[in-house]
Protein backbone atom coordinates (compact mmCIF):
# COMPACT_ATOMS: atom_id res chain seq x y z
CA UNK A 1 0.00 0.00 0.00
CA UNK A 2 1.50 3.30 -1.08
CA UNK A 3 1.61 6.26 1.29
CA UNK A 4 1.34 9.97 0.45
CA UNK A 5 4.65 11.46 -0.64
CA UNK A 6 4.49 13.86 2.34
CA UNK A 7 4.42 10.86 4.69
CA UNK A 8 7.48 9.34 3.05
CA UNK A 9 9.29 12.68 3.26
CA UNK A 10 8.45 12.91 6.98
CA UNK A 11 9.78 9.39 7.52
CA UNK A 12 12.99 10.27 5.66
CA UNK A 13 13.43 13.36 7.85
CA UNK A 14 12.98 11.31 11.03
CA UNK A 15 15.42 8.66 9.76
CA UNK A 16 18.09 11.34 9.53
CA UNK A 17 18.11 11.52 13.36
CA UNK A 18 20.88 9.49 15.05
CA UNK A 19 19.89 5.92 15.87
CA UNK A 20 16.49 6.09 14.16
CA UNK A 21 15.72 3.33 11.67
CA UNK A 22 12.81 2.96 9.27
CA UNK A 23 10.56 1.16 11.76
CA UNK A 24 10.84 3.80 14.49
CA UNK A 25 10.67 6.63 11.96
CA UNK A 26 7.32 5.33 10.69
CA UNK A 27 6.09 4.86 14.27
CA UNK A 28 6.95 8.46 15.12
CA UNK A 29 5.46 9.74 11.86
CA UNK A 30 2.14 8.05 12.64
CA UNK A 31 2.27 9.47 16.18
CA UNK A 32 2.87 13.02 14.95
CA UNK A 33 0.06 12.82 12.41
CA UNK A 34 -2.37 11.79 15.14
CA UNK A 35 -1.63 14.89 17.27
CA UNK A 36 -3.65 18.10 17.13
CA UNK A 37 -2.32 21.28 15.54
CA UNK A 38 -1.46 22.88 18.90
CA UNK A 39 0.89 20.01 19.75
CA UNK A 40 2.61 20.24 16.36
CA UNK A 41 2.95 24.04 16.54
CA UNK A 42 4.42 23.85 20.05
CA UNK A 43 6.80 21.07 18.99
CA UNK A 44 8.06 23.09 16.03
CA UNK A 45 8.36 26.25 18.17
CA UNK A 46 10.55 24.48 20.71
CA UNK A 47 12.89 23.28 17.98
CA UNK A 48 13.10 26.77 16.47
CA UNK A 49 13.65 28.40 19.88
CA UNK A 50 16.45 25.96 20.69
CA UNK A 51 18.13 26.55 17.34
CA UNK A 52 17.79 30.33 17.68
CA UNK A 53 18.82 30.78 21.31
CA UNK A 54 21.39 28.05 21.94
CA UNK A 55 24.91 28.79 20.71
CA UNK A 56 28.32 27.15 20.93
CA UNK A 57 30.91 28.35 23.43
CA UNK A 58 33.68 30.23 21.64
CA UNK A 59 36.28 28.26 23.58
CA UNK A 60 35.12 24.65 23.89
CA UNK A 61 32.01 24.38 21.63
CA UNK A 62 29.76 23.37 24.53
CA UNK A 63 26.15 24.47 24.09
CA UNK A 64 24.76 27.38 26.11
CA UNK A 65 23.10 30.78 25.87
CA UNK A 66 26.30 32.87 26.00
CA UNK A 67 29.57 33.13 24.09
CA UNK A 68 31.31 31.54 27.08
CA UNK A 69 29.66 28.44 28.54
CA UNK A 70 29.03 27.79 32.24
CA UNK A 71 32.05 25.50 32.44
CA UNK A 72 34.59 27.80 30.79
CA UNK A 73 33.37 30.77 32.87
CA UNK A 74 33.39 28.88 36.18
CA UNK A 75 36.28 30.12 38.35
CA UNK A 76 36.06 26.97 40.47
CA UNK A 77 37.11 24.72 37.56
CA UNK A 78 40.74 23.60 37.23
CA UNK A 79 42.12 25.71 34.38
CA UNK A 80 45.31 23.63 34.21
CA UNK A 81 43.44 20.57 32.87
CA UNK A 82 41.93 20.15 29.41
CA UNK A 83 39.96 17.08 28.37
CA UNK A 84 39.46 16.57 24.65
CA UNK A 85 36.17 14.83 23.82
CA UNK A 86 34.38 14.14 20.55
CA UNK A 87 30.80 15.29 21.15
CA UNK A 88 28.58 17.33 23.43
CA UNK A 89 27.08 14.03 24.57
CA UNK A 90 30.52 12.90 25.78
CA UNK A 91 30.93 16.11 27.79
CA UNK A 92 27.47 15.74 29.34
CA UNK A 93 28.18 12.11 30.22
CA UNK A 94 31.42 12.95 32.04
CA UNK A 95 29.87 15.93 33.82
CA UNK A 96 26.95 13.82 35.06
CA UNK A 97 29.40 11.38 36.64
CA UNK A 98 31.09 14.15 38.70
CA UNK A 99 34.58 12.74 38.15
CA UNK A 100 36.40 15.64 36.47
CA UNK A 101 36.71 19.33 37.30
CA UNK A 102 38.83 20.72 34.47
CA UNK A 103 37.92 22.31 31.13
CA UNK A 104 36.90 20.63 27.88
CA UNK A 105 37.46 20.89 24.15
CA UNK A 106 34.84 19.30 21.90
CA UNK A 107 36.25 18.24 18.53
CA UNK A 108 32.82 17.77 16.91
CA UNK A 109 34.08 14.73 15.06
CA UNK A 110 36.93 12.29 14.61
CA UNK A 111 39.24 11.91 11.63
CA UNK A 112 37.74 9.24 9.38
CA UNK A 113 38.68 8.24 5.85
CA UNK A 114 35.64 5.94 5.76
CA UNK A 115 33.26 8.81 6.52
CA UNK A 116 35.30 11.36 4.57
CA UNK A 117 35.87 13.45 7.70
CA UNK A 118 39.12 15.43 7.65
CA UNK A 119 40.70 17.78 10.17
CA UNK A 120 39.16 20.83 8.50
CA UNK A 121 35.67 19.49 9.23
CA UNK A 122 36.30 19.44 12.99
CA UNK A 123 37.49 21.61 15.88
CA UNK A 124 40.72 19.62 16.14
CA UNK A 125 42.66 22.22 14.17
CA UNK A 126 42.22 24.89 16.87
CA UNK A 127 43.35 22.76 19.83
CA UNK A 128 46.99 23.82 19.56
CA UNK A 129 46.13 27.51 19.56
CA UNK A 130 43.93 27.05 22.61
CA UNK A 131 46.66 25.18 24.49
CA UNK A 132 49.24 27.84 23.63
CA UNK A 133 46.93 30.61 24.84
CA UNK A 134 45.88 28.81 28.02
CA UNK A 135 47.56 27.75 31.26
CA UNK A 136 47.15 24.01 30.76
CA UNK A 137 49.55 21.55 32.33
CA UNK A 138 47.60 18.36 31.62
CA UNK A 139 45.81 17.26 28.45
CA UNK A 140 43.52 14.21 28.59
CA UNK A 141 42.52 12.78 25.22
CA UNK A 142 39.13 11.09 25.56
CA UNK A 143 38.25 10.21 21.99
CA UNK A 144 36.53 6.85 21.46
CA UNK A 145 38.34 3.50 21.45
CA UNK A 146 37.61 2.95 17.77
CA UNK A 147 39.93 3.08 14.77
CA UNK A 148 38.86 6.67 14.06
CA UNK A 149 39.23 7.63 17.71
CA UNK A 150 42.76 6.23 17.86
CA UNK A 151 43.77 7.96 14.62
CA UNK A 152 42.40 11.23 16.01
CA UNK A 153 44.23 10.78 19.32
CA UNK A 154 47.52 10.13 17.51
CA UNK A 155 47.03 13.23 15.37
CA UNK A 156 46.41 15.40 18.44
CA UNK A 157 49.55 14.09 20.16
CA UNK A 158 51.67 14.86 17.11
CA UNK A 159 50.09 18.30 16.79
CA UNK A 160 51.10 19.16 20.37
CA UNK A 161 54.53 17.50 20.36
CA UNK A 162 56.50 20.75 20.20
CA UNK A 163 54.71 22.34 23.17
CA UNK A 164 56.78 22.02 26.33
CA UNK A 165 55.73 21.68 29.96
CA UNK A 166 52.46 19.83 29.38
CA UNK A 167 51.64 16.21 30.14
CA UNK A 168 49.43 14.34 27.67
CA UNK A 169 47.27 11.41 28.74
CA UNK A 170 44.90 8.96 27.06
CA UNK A 171 41.89 7.68 28.99
CA UNK A 172 42.72 4.25 30.38
CA UNK A 173 41.16 0.82 30.44
CA UNK A 174 37.44 0.65 31.10
CA UNK A 175 35.94 1.98 27.89
CA UNK A 176 35.40 -1.11 25.66
CA UNK A 177 36.97 -1.33 22.23
CA UNK A 178 34.82 0.09 19.43
CA UNK A 179 32.81 2.04 21.99
CA UNK A 180 32.35 5.68 22.95
CA UNK A 181 32.11 7.54 26.25
CA UNK A 182 28.39 8.28 26.11
CA UNK A 183 27.61 4.54 26.46
CA UNK A 184 29.75 4.04 29.56
CA UNK A 185 28.37 3.93 33.10
CA UNK A 186 29.69 6.09 35.94
CA UNK A 187 32.02 3.46 37.38
CA UNK A 188 33.53 2.68 33.98
CA UNK A 189 34.14 6.37 33.34
CA UNK A 190 35.69 6.79 36.78
CA UNK A 191 38.07 3.88 36.17
CA UNK A 192 39.02 5.03 32.67
CA UNK A 193 39.97 8.49 33.90
CA UNK A 194 41.64 7.25 37.10
CA UNK A 195 43.70 4.81 35.01
CA UNK A 196 44.59 7.29 32.30
CA UNK A 197 47.95 6.50 30.76
CA UNK A 198 50.66 9.03 30.10
CA UNK A 199 51.64 9.12 26.44
CA UNK A 200 53.93 12.12 26.55
CA UNK A 201 55.67 14.25 29.18
UniProtKB/Swiss-Prot annotation:
UniProt cross-references to PROSITE patterns, sorted A to Z: TOPRIM
InterPro entries, per the entry: DNA_Rcmb_RecR, Rcmb_RecR, TOPRIM_dom, TOPRIM_RecR
UniProt zinc finger (C4-type) residues: 57-72
UniProt KW keywords: DNA damage, DNA recombination, DNA repair, Metal-binding, Zinc, Zinc-finger
Family annotation (SUPFAM superfamilies): Recombination protein RecR
Record GO terms (molecular function): DNA binding; zinc ion binding
Pfam families the record matches: RecR_C (PF21175), RecR_HhH (PF21176), Toprim_4 (PF13662)
GO biological process assignments: DNA recombination; DNA repair
Domain named Toprim: residues: 80-176
Superkingdom to which the source organism belongs: Bacteria
Free-text function comment from the UniProt entry: May play a role in DNA repair. It seems to be involved in an RecBC-independent recombinational process of DNA repair. It may act with RecF and RecO.
HAMAP family: RecR
Family, similarity comment: Belongs to the RecR family.
Alphabetized NCBIfam families for the sequence: recR (TIGR00615)
Protein name: Recombination protein RecR
Lineage of the species this protein comes from: Bacteria, Bacillati, Mycoplasmatota, Mycoplasmoidales, Mycoplasmoidaceae
